[in-house]
């Protein structure tokens, strides 16, 4: 069903949070009393508003009465206006300027690229710490204006905005700690490096689903560009070289990396991918969302040495030599056949006779008795069988259950089977 068009923020607010749709809550619920209004006003005498308002996909195009917004929203700290029809920044400003406690604002999927954001409008956002502009097609000029007027902005979401380039403002933003800029088309490192210039305090950079093809930057320059970067996501980027992975070591504070779905790792098995990456990134404590334990790191580094042990010296990565210094040269792991043994050579003892024979371990005790019938000259019903493990400290074990498979005894070459007669 299509959303009605031309609706105001206040109209939707009153409808959604009326007592009929949003019953009064005790405790943290906030009851807002509104003075009597002219006849025909959609406002109720009393609304119950939480501090987090979710008004997404409501067809909102404008603010409505600003006095009413101020009366209702003085306590509101989070506001989700995503997927509405707001296309004028002035209308957004009318809403936000009357929500003095606002810290989180989501304007995703509103057609705001159709208007210019003036600094006077952006100034009404000054207290916002987290701003979401996904799929808003916000221009870099708009982003620059926001950065100038939001001195406390810590988290910015610019996903799905069709960016192919990055434009730097005249002044950098020191407050921003987290930037989500996924699902754009930022292929060249020359564009990504601008983000380091713009946001020198950046802690988390999420670049997933861009097509970045290489990290073309000297190691010392990387450290200066992103001195505080702790976490980076390169999920589904276009990286194709191990040199690009090695360059991540140049970020002095990097602890967390996401690298799933990149062309470089496609030829490797799941085990090889993780171990080879862990071994190359000694400072990373979390890879693809999973903690790297000390035990996993040592296993990965030893695996790395063995993986490259037979590679020509000119092709061996530098990290290999570092790990050789740490662990020394390691011999290849012995290949152990873990398949169950199918037969065993055992000694069969009966009276004073000893006969060496090969027995199938997939047969049952009853079938073994049939095999021994000719040798010991006893009917199967008169046989008592005992199994003796030549390496075990215990005595013989009676093989009393006819349907039990021989492999369940753990029979190996050199073990003994004793046969006695029940009539003995």
Swiss-Prot record:
Keyword field: Coiled coil, Cytoplasm, Cytoskeleton, Leucine-rich repeat, Phosphoprotein, Repeat
GO cellular component term, pick one: cytoplasm
InterPro entries linked to this entry: LRR_dom_sf (IPR032675), TBCEL_Ubl (IPR047991), Ubiquitin-like_dom (IPR000626), Ubiquitin-like_domsf (IPR029071)
LRR repeat copies, ranges: 73-98, 99-123, 124-147, 152-173, 175-196, 201-222, 228-249
PANTHER family per the UniProt record, alphabetical: LEUCINE-RICH REPEAT-CONTAINING PROTEIN 51
Domain LRRCT: 262-303
Phosphoserine, modified sites: 18, 41
Function: Acts as a regulator of tubulin stability.
Name the record gives this protein: Tubulin-specific chaperone cofactor E-like protein
Residue ranges annotated for the Ubiquitin-like domain, each copy included: 334-424
Pfam families documented for this protein: LRR_9, Ubiquitin_2
Residue ranges the record marks as coiled coil: 349-375
Cell compartments where the protein resides: Cytoplasm, Cytoskeleton
Ribosomal protein keyword on record: no
Gene name in the database record: Tbcel
């Amino acid at each position: 069903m299509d959303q009605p068009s031309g609706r105001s923020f206040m109209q939707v607010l009153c409808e959604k949070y009326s007592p009929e749709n949003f019953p009064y809550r005790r405790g943290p619920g906030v009851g807002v009393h509104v003075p009597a209004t002219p006849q025909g006003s959609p406002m109720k005498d009393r609304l119950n508003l939480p501090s987090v308002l979710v008004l997404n996909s409501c067809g909102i195009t404008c603010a409505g009465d600003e006095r009413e917004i101020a009366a209702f929203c003085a306590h509101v700290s989070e506001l989700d206006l995503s997927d509405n029809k707001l296309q004028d920044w002035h209308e957004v400003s009318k809403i936000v300027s009357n929500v003095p406690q606002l810290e989180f604002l989501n304007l995703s999927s509103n057609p705001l690229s159709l208007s210019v954001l003036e600094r006077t409008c952006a100034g009404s956002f000054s207290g916002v710490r987290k701003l979401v502009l996904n799929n808003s097609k916000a221009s870099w000029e708009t982003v620059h204006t926001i950065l100038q007027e939001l001195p406390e902005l810590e988290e910015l979401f610019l996903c799905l905005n069709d960016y192919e380039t990055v434009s730097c403002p005249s002044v950098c933003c020191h407050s921003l700690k987290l930037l989500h800029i996924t699902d754009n088309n930022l292929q060249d490192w020359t564009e990504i490096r601008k983000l380091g210039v713009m946001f020198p305090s950046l802690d988390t950079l999420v670049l997933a689903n861009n097509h970045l093809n290489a990290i073309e930057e000297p190691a010392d320059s990387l450290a200066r560009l992103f001195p505080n970067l702790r976490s980076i996501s390169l999920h589904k980027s276009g990286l194709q070289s191990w040199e690009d992975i090695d360059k991540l070591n140049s970020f002095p504070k990097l602890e967390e990396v996401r690298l799933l779905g990149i062309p470089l790792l496609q030829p490797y098995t799941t085990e090889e991918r993780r171990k080879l990456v862990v071994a190359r990134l000694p400072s990373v404590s979390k890879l693809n969302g999973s903690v790297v334990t000390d035990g996993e790191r040592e296993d990965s580094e030893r695996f790395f040495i063995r993986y490259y042990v037979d590679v020509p010296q000119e092709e061996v990565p530098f990290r290999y030599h570092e790990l050789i210094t740490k662990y020394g040269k390691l011999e290849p792991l012995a290949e152990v056949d873990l398949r169950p043994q199918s037969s065993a050579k055992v000694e069969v003892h009966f009276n004073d006779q000893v006969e060496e024979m090969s027995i199938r371990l997939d047969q049952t005790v009853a079938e073994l008795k049939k095999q021994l019938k000719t040798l010991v000259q006893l009917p199967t019903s008169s046989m008592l069988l005992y199994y003796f493990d030549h390496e075990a400290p215990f005595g013989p074990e009676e093989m009393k259950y006819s349907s039990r498979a021989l492999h369940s005894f753990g029979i190996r070459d050199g073990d003994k089977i004793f046969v006695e007669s029940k009539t003995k």
